[in-house]
Amino acid sequence: MTEMPKKTGRKFKFFKFKGLGSLSNLPRSFSLRRSSASASIRSCPEPDTFEATQDDMVTLPKSPPAYARSSDMYSHMGTMPRPNIKKAQKQQAVQKAQEVSRESHLVSRRLPEPPDLEAAKEAGEGTEALLEDTAPSAVEVDPMRELEDLTVDTEKEQVPGDVSPERTAAELEAAGDYVKFSKEKYILDSSPEKLHKELEEELKLSSTDLRSHAWYHGRIPREVSETLVQRNGDFLIRDSLTSLGDYVLTCRWHNQALHFKINKVVVKAGESYTHIRYLFEQESFDHVPALVRYHVGSRKAVSEQSGAIIYCPVNRTFPLRYLEASYGLSQGSSKTASPASPSGSKGSHMKRRSITMTDGLTTDKVTRSDGCPNSTSLPHPRDSIRNCALSMDQIPDLHSPLSPISESPSSPAYSTVTRVHAPSATPSTSAQPASPVARRSSEPQLCPGNTPKPPGESDRAPHASPSHTLCKASPSPSLSSYSDPDSGHYCQLQPPVRGSREQAAGETPRKARGSGERQKELLENGVSDGEWGKTFTVPVVEATSSFNLATFQSQLIPKENRPLEVALLRKVKELLSEVDARTLARHVTKVDCLVARILGVTKEMQTLMGVRWGMELLTLPHGRQLRLDLLERFHTMSIMLAVDILGCTGSAEERAALLHKTIQLAAELRGTMGNMFSFAAVMGALEMAQISRLEQTWMTLRQRHTEGAILYEKKLKPFLKSLNEGKEGPPLSNTTFPHVLPFITLLECDSAPAEGPEPWGSTEHGVEVVLAHLEAARTVAHHGGLYHTNAEVKLQGFQARPELLEVFSTEFQMRLLWGSQGANSSQAWRYEKFDKVLTALSHKLEPAIRSSEL
């Protein structure tokens, strides 16, 4: 019994030895199979037989491991073992890691050159030698094992020993650029049919959408826009790359490319109503297409100084998405930085195009790769950009001390902040911190660099901030040549001051300047002799009316006349019936603009007023006489039109036809001419109680002139109501005379006649209406030059008839209504007297129905 276990143990030991020996001999018996394996196996070292594990890829299946799950070893079909599942999954993971590794270094690694025949033979012989050599003296590492290590530890990078960390970082950055480049390349590789279809879809959008206009080119560089405008009069609109949300008008005039910035502001018309306006010099528009139509249609110069006229749009032939990708690629690949700059790698522009805003900088400022070559000494590339980029706040100051934005009133209705730079007392090169209030909160304080200035601008440099000192002290050779592609030199929208700079430097800067002084400085800009820049002229307070009845000379009315002479009334009726409503509206508008000092303002008148335009004078204390004159003209115009209607003693059809023409006149004044003053006067005549009670006349109007009745009831009356309540206003680009009646009535309420409850008289919304009109007055005062320009455009080429101009003059109307004697009476007496006359005329045409007759 004792010998049996020993014999069994000996047999077991012998079997174990033979089994292990046979397993260890497997690689030698299958050497031919190993010779046909991949060439990469030649670097695999051959350790001792009992110490090394065999490769799964090139050996026969080994015995199953000691511990195995049933799901790994046996299938659901039977008990057949399947030990290769884990190995197949591991092999797939290794192959996937290998593909990822190859893609990540696709750009940085150079592809090996294809070997020739001799090299292939040598490689084959070397492979056989390595396969036969099993000594542990091999030095190279198995690439498959390297990939396995990569999959286990993903955070550990395999860096060759001869490659520096800087090179590896550059390769990784280049790999990121390659991914971004592929995205842009996908856009550029679109088929022409797809691009053409996309362009058609953009052009089919609403006309108010900027993308629907072919002259809009989106975000293209400044240099590209200059190459697109080739002939005088060519123009295009592009996005401002330095001021987010603004646009730039690029045109060519006198063989020179000019750039004009279009500022976007938010105008607060009421407490809860705001709308966006686009300011351009002294003009304001609802949208950019309206600005383009205005300048192209009127052939008005874009700026007074340059005299540039735009009339030939440069249309785009590709969609906006394609243009941005195309010019972005060309810009990023063409610009190279100095070797010392960390952002000088190729493709860095495309990598950083995805940045939208960094510390107030727009994309173009961040993506510059040729900024400061010595920026490696700074802690972060963003600091170098902050110190070397141009500030939009200082670009206008390099040209003129008066920025176009500086004209905007200090009103919460405007999003831009008034920027006034007082002249320094003595020229100084020391750095002084600038006030943070002098710039917009969304714009950083940046270094202007050594931007070249026009001649004579060296003594007008703005105060430098600490960042300015840092940038000026930098010995960078390329700093002087730095120029932002979009923020460069915008053309001046205001003429430069021609006064003596020495006197301006010697004077003490005033801390606060009123509206009159500021506008007087604007007035001085256009003076050739510079006399107004030396002394200040006190405005003259007018005490007498501009309507001088004593010196009035007329071709239609005699020197002495009685009120409402029949022959004179008949003559006026004939003159009004000879022309259409539009011609009448032009005559009325011309006289209105002359009275309100929108047109015909001379330099002497501006000196006496202290301001440039009558619209600003209306809001000032010494403009009281002008306010009274406008109130006189408004009521006199309404009464004369009412007399014209009530004096028609013919049939109801004749009065209805005259009523229809009056409605057409109101529509022309509102729409075609943009004259809200006379529009309100005509509507005031139609809404008089003496006219609105003529039921037969209005019934005939609805039957014979239905469109006129609908126009009056559905459009004109609601529009006038919204004007009086301060809820709605006409577009500034189409306005020649704004609706000034509410606020001049508020300012002169003790002198205005009582005509019933006003919109601001209600207890519910009275205060809101008053505030809306007072804020509208500030807007009116600010846009006096715009109304002047619009009036000149509307009346350009207009040949007025002297008789009609005289009929619509206030002196003629006063003489016609009250005679030569009564015209000099008090205003209250005249209005009260004529109210009774109008009531009598109305009852004569359509007597009131008595209660006994019902």
Curated annotation (Swiss-Prot):
Keywords annotated in UniProt: Cell membrane, Cell projection, Cytoplasm, Membrane, Phosphoprotein, SH2 domain
PROSITE patterns: RASGEF_CAT (PS50009), SH2 (PS50001)
Record's comment describing the protein's domains: The C-terminal Cdc25-homology/Ras-GEF domain adopts a closed conformation rendering it incapable of carrying out canonical exchange factor function, this closed conformation is required for interaction with BCAR1.
Role of this protein: Acts as an adapter protein that mediates cell signaling pathways involved in cellular functions such as cell adhesion and migration, tissue organization, and the regulation of the immune response. Plays a role in integrin-mediated cell adhesion through BCAR1-CRK-RAPGEF1 signaling and activation of the small GTPase RAP1. Promotes cell migration and invasion through the extracellular matrix. Required for marginal zone B-cell development and thymus-independent type 2 immune responses.
Region described as Disordered: 34-129, 330-384, 398-417, 422-520
Positions of modified residues (Phosphotyrosine): 273, 278, 787
Residue span(s) of domain SH2: 215-314
Positions of modified residues (Phosphoserine): 22, 354, 435
The Ras-GEF domain, residue ranges: 580-848
Residue ranges, compositional bias (Low complexity): 34-43, 333-347, 400-415, 422-436, 474-485
Signal sequence, renumbered to the chain: none
Cellular-component GO terms for this entry: axon; cytosol; ruffle membrane
A Gene Ontology molecular function term of the record: guanyl-nucleotide exchange factor activity
Organism: Mus musculus (Mouse)
UniProt tissue specificity: Expressed in the olfactory bulb and olfactory sensory neurons (at protein level). Expressed in B cells (at protein level). Expressed in T lymphocytes.
Outcome of gene disruption: In one study knockout mice are viable and born at the expected Mendelian rate. In another study the majority of knockout mice die after birth, those that survive show severe lamination defects and loss of cellular organization in their olfactory bulb, with a reduction in gonadotropin-releasing hormone in the preoptic region of the hypothalamus. Mice that die at birth are morphologically normal apart from a marked reduction in the size of the olfactory bulb, which exhibits abnormal cellular organization in the outer layers and a lack of innervation of OSNs.
Chain coiled-coil ranges: none
Bias (Basic and acidic residues) ranges: 99-124, 508-520
Subcellular location: Cytoplasm; Cell membrane; Cell projection, Axon; Cell projection, Ruffle membrane
Protein name stated in the entry: SH2 domain-containing protein 3C
Oligomer and partners: Component of a complex comprised of SH2D3C, BCAR1/CAS, and CRK. Within the complex, interacts with CRK and (via C-terminus) with BCAR1/CAS (via C-terminus). Interacts with NEDD9/HEF1. Interacts with EPHB2.
Membrane protein topology class: Peripheral membrane protein
Lineage: Eukaryota, Metazoa, Chordata, Craniata, Vertebrata
Matches recorded under PANTHER family: BREAST CANCER ANTI-ESTROGEN RESISTANCE PROTEIN 3 HOMOLOG-LIKE PROTEIN (PTHR14247), SH2 DOMAIN-CONTAINING PROTEIN 3C (PTHR14247:SF6)
Swiss-Prot/TrEMBL GO biological process terms: signal transduction; small GTPase-mediated signal transduction
